[in-house]
A protein has these predicted regions:
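N-terminal, charged amphipathic alpha-helical interaction modules
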Residues: 52-125
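N-terminal low-complexity or amphipathic/hydrophobic leaders
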Residues: 12-81
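A hydrophobic, small-residue-rich beta->alpha segment in the mid-to-C-terminal subdomain
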Residues: 183-226
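Short helix/loop capping segments that flank catalytic or ligand/cofactor-binding pockets
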Residues: 58-59, 128-129, 171, 189-191
Length: 239
C-alpha cells in the first residue's frame, strides 16, 4: 500500500486573521514535512514560497519586490507544505487567464472534498501579486492588508505553487485556491492576485491526509478569543 500523502499545516489561517503573527516553527523544521507550499514569516513579514524543498521570502515596500532565500532558523506563524506528487500533469498550450485555467484544473478533480497541491511552471503574459507588510502590532490581518503593496509584471517565467482547499475546511485554510508565485530568476514573487498564462505545465497532486499542528507553547494562541463570523469576513477581504 502506498504511503499516504499528508498536507502539513502549522496553525490556521483563521488565527493569522485574528492578529497572531508571532513565528513559532523554524523553517528548517517545516521543510521536513514537504517540498511545496506557502505561508508567511514571523510578524507576517512578506510571503513564504516553498518550491522544490527550498523556502523563499517575497516582500516589498518600494517600487520593486524583493525575493530572498529563507534561512532555516527563521520562523513561521502559519504555513502549509506537502510532499508534492503529481497525479495529473497537463500542458497548457494557449493563453488563458487565471479563472479559465482554474476551470480546466477543476475538471481533473475527483470530487470536491479533498485538498490538492498545485504546481504550475510556465511563461506568463501577466502576473499580479501582493505582499503582506510586516506588522508586530495586534492589528487584525484585514486592517494590515489594506496597505499591502501590489506589483504587476509582464512577460515573466516562473512557478506558481499552491493548495486548493475544499469548502468544508474554510477557516482552517482559505477555501478554494491559495497560490504564491516566484520567478525563475528569483527577482519577483508574492501572493497571486491574478495572472494570464501564455503556456506552461500544470501539475496536480493528491492529498490523502491533513496533519494539523498548533502552536501549543504560544500563550497568545492558547487564550485567544475568536469571532468566527468576523474571522471569515476578514479572510474573504484579505485573500
Amino acid at each position: 500500500m502506498a504511503e499516504p500523502i499528508k498536507l502539513f499545516q502549522y496553525n490556521t489561517l483563521g488565527a493569522l486573521m485574528a492578529g497572531l503573527y508571532d513565528g513559532s516553527m523554524p523553517v528548517g523544521e517545516l521543510l521536513q514535512y514537504g517540498d511545496l507550499g506557502l505561508g508567511t514569516l514571523d510578524s507576517i513579514d512578506g510571503e513564504l514560497i516553498v518550491l522544490d524543498g527550498k523556502a523563499y521570502q517575497a516582500k516589498g515596500s518600494g517600487e520593486v519586490p524583493e525575493v530572498v532565500e529563507v534561512s532555516p532558523d527563521m520562523t513561521v506563524p502559519y504555513a502549509a507544505v506537502v510532499p508534492h506528487q503529481a497525479e495529473v500533469i497537463f500542458r497548457q498550450r494557449f493563453e488563458m487567464n487565471d479563472k479559465e485555467l482554474e476551470k480546466r484544473i477543476e475538471s481533473y478533480y475527483d470530487g470536491e472534498n479533498l485538498f490538492r497541491s498545485i504546481k504550475i511552471h510556465g511563461d506568463f503574459a501577466r502576473m499580479h501579486v501582493r505582499m503582506i507588510p510586516k506588522s508586530t502590532t495586534e492589528r487584525k490581518f484585514a486592517e494590515v492588508a489594506v496597505n499591502q503593496p501590489e506589483y504587476c509584471k509582464e512577460d515573466i517565467t516562473g512557478t506558481i505553487v499552491g493548495i486548493w482547499t475544499p469548502e468544508i475546511f474554510h477557516g482552517v485554510s482559505l477555501a478554494g485556491y491559495h497560490l504564491h508565485f516566484v520567478s525563475d530568476d528569483l527577482t519577483f514573487g508574492g501572493h497571486v492576485m491574478d495572472f494570464v498564462i501564455k503556456e506552461g505545465v500544470v501539475e496536480l497532486g493528491a492529498v490523502d491526509q491533513l496533519d494539523q499542528r498548533f502552536p501549543v507553547q504560544d500563550r497568545k494562541y492558547l487564550f485567544a478569543k475568536f469571532n468566527m463570523d468576523e474571522m471569515k469576513e476578514d479572510m474573504e477581504k484579505s485573500e
